[in-house]
């Protein structure tokens, strides 16, 4: 029998509607969105629904991931949306009996891999990722960028703008 591995993507692969078919089809996925929303109600959304509704800021995981909004591409929100979607799909696969022998993730995806490995409780993972997104947004506000340059240092200096 073949070995199965789960691979989780990092930030950058998000889009409005990601995971919606899973959410609308499988109770296991819906439960993950509800759990994430419950954790965030206590941590961030708190009792701000009216203020957030007026400002346009998302006040539920469903609104953030399924309704058209600019926040899906803002790190503060992107990370919790990605993890919620990853864990929702993971729970559906597990309910169908598809168990992985290993899991790996790129950057943010490492937390999806932690969920797959069962090493942390989901509410804790949601709290950690929500705060990670906030801190990363504060450290690198909108408009920042990153690049990876492979090669000798002497070449790197020649290719970077001064």
What are these regions (language model features)?
Residues 105, 109:
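Gly/Ala-rich beta-loop-alpha elbow adjacent to hydrolase catalytic centers
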Residues 2-104:
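Helix-rich "cap/lid" substructures immediately adjacent to catalytic or cofactor-binding pockets
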Residues 11, 38-56, 116-158:
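Alpha/beta catalytic cores of group-transfer enzymes, especially the acyltransferase/condensing modules
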């Amino acid at each position: 029998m073949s070995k199965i591995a789960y691979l989780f993507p990092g930030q950058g692969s998000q889009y409005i509607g990601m995971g919606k078919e899973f959410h609308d089809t499988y109770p296991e996925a819906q439960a993950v969105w509800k759990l994430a929303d419950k954790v965030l109600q206590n941590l961030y959304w708190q009792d701000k629904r009216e203020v957030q509704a007026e400002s346009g800021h998302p006040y539920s995981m469903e609104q953030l991931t399924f309704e058209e909004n600019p926040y899906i591409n803002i790190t503060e929100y992107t990370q919790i949306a990605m993890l919620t979607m990853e864990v929702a799909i993971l729970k559906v696969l597990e309910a169908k009996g598809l168990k992985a022998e290993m899991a790996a993730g790129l950057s943010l995806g490492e937390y999806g891999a932690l969920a797959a490995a069962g090493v942390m409780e989901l509410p804790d993972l949601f709290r950690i990722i929500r705060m990670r997104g906030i801190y990363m947004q504060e450290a690198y506000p909108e408009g920042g960028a990153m690049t990876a340059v492979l090669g000798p240092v002497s070449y790197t200096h020649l290719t970077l703008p001064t």
